[in-house]
């Protein structure tokens, strides 16, 4: 039996935004919740800057790469929650694991409002099921995930052999996984596969140009 034809016209994958050092360091940068509470499981200040800047990247009021689309469906890795912990302003449990991906897309989701469908049901390790769900979405999809597992997601996407996907998430000069790129997959109905490209965000000072 042949695989079903994907419905998602565009799939855009990003890593969550910047985080504090691991293990948490005594000096800054610290992780902070949206209300400014120190929390090493949250984004750093630079991470929140990127999360805000991504709104205009994906929902532009100015020209951006034409291949970038305003997402209609947004996936972020499931938060490892603890029902006894309080929620922050975004509605995520304070002190829980995995929240940075949801924090990264929160400003985008707020801007889009009810026009976007959010899915936080899939955990790390559920990449195959998650991308199968994403490819069945009838419109542009944005996925925010932990960078170590993004190649697992990409490996499940049928990609044109002329645009192969790297085996690992790109690193900066220090060997750390980059925060400033988008992996873009555009569906080619004639080939029933996706064309892959690597798009730099170029949002913050220090972002790499390619």
Regions found by a protein language model. Name each.
Residues 3-138, 149-210:
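Active-site-proximal alpha-helix that buttresses catalytic centers in soluble enzyme cores
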Residues 141:
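Mobile, glycine-rich extracellular loop/lid and propeptide segments
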Residues 144-146:
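Short beta-strand segments
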